Amino acid sequence: MENDNFVVLKNVCKRFGDNTVINNLDLEIKKGSLVTLLGPSGCGKTTVLRLVAGLEKPTSGQIFIDGEDVTNTSIQQRDICMVFQSYALFPHLSLYDNVGYGLKMLKLPAAEIKQRVDDALKLVDLSGMGDRFVDQISGGQQQRIALARALVLKPKVLLFDEPLSNLDANLRRSMRETIRDLQQRFNITSLYVTHDQTEAFAVSDTVIVMKDGEIMQQGSPDDLYKTPSSMFMANFMGDANIFTGRYDDGQLNINGYCIPADPEVVQGKAEGDYQIGVRPEAILLTSEGEPSQQCIVNNVVYMGSMYEVAVTWHDQELLLQLNSSQFDANLSDHAYLTINPTGIFLLPFDA
């Protein structure tokens, strides 16, 4: 086992009766990194988390933590902690006792428990609130207590099971920042599960996208968005306008509109016909252009931070996302589009 691969799943399968939920999965998490499992409901991401935790046993395959085979090891012996979607706090205990519960189970000295609990409450900005009870604090504060309860045990691995799904948008944003800051500060190897792409991108070093119990693609958030490996990935990672076009002689030809090919986009690609994807933010509208660039503006929706614009170009409806400085309210229904070469990706027709 390589030293920097702290959590490793090797050829893991999980079946419930005749239903295969995880199919020959290989996964590696480097020490101190945060890896997120992202995917639609039923893709198997939560099952993987439960396998790492020891809440489920694999049908076949092996699981290693810190070089040790823990495939058949109980959850109590794995030195991991989990932060749940439901918080799982004890309503009859004070916040102090909730955070210190695991330490008491370890029968640590009272003075050490007090110091570690006080430190943990300070980390999550809840100092001085230890004597309150769960029903006296907000949902965001409850999630901070759940996080403090995990951190106070100083686990080898920290697991997050959709921890922010019960919070409103502003609290989710704040808690994303808190989780990422504390994870990096303490260099805790972490596995995070969510169905929210924005959340995954905000907290992760690496994102692993799953579908039907298998890994579809993994990489940095930037890599997954800019270079999807399949049509599923292209659409799952955000809106995409898909064309049939050609890469030839350093240019991309889409509906007769020739665009200089960005070297990073076409790196390793042979010349030929492709499915060409263009992200909505890579298309701009102007009042002048070549005939091949002419389009019809069908609809404009103000979204606060941006405008979503629907246009028809060569009988195909496209989605554009323009910020306020890019959108001209005086633009006529007949406009011209330009495409930023860096917002393009190429896929073979069988992807």
UniProtKB/Swiss-Prot annotation:
It is found in: Cell inner membrane. Pfam families: ABC_tran, TOBE_2. The keyword Cell wall biogenesis/degradation does not apply. SUPFAM superfamilies: MOP-like, P-loop containing nucleoside triphosphate hydrolases. Its EC number is 7.2.2.7. GO terms for cellular component: ATP-binding cassette (ABC) transporter complex. Residues 7-237 form the ABC transporter domain. It catalyses: Fe(3+)(out) + ATP + H2O = Fe(3+)(in) + ADP + phosphate + H(+). It is a peripheral membrane protein. Keywords: ATP-binding, Cell inner membrane, Cell membrane, Ion transport, Iron, Iron transport, Membrane, Nucleotide-binding, Translocase, Transport. It is an enzyme of class 7 (translocase). PANTHER family: SPERMIDINE/PUTRESCINE IMPORT ATP-BINDING PROTEIN POTA, SPERMIDINE_PUTRESCINE IMPORT ATP-BINDING PROTEIN POTA. Belongs to the ABC transporter superfamily. Fe(3+) ion importer (TC 3.A.1.10) family. Part of the ABC transporter complex FbpABC involved in Fe(3+) ions import. Responsible for energy coupling to the transport system. The complex is composed of two ATP-binding proteins (FbpC), two transmembrane proteins (FbpB) and a solute-binding protein (FbpA). This is Fe(3+) ions import ATP-binding protein FbpC.
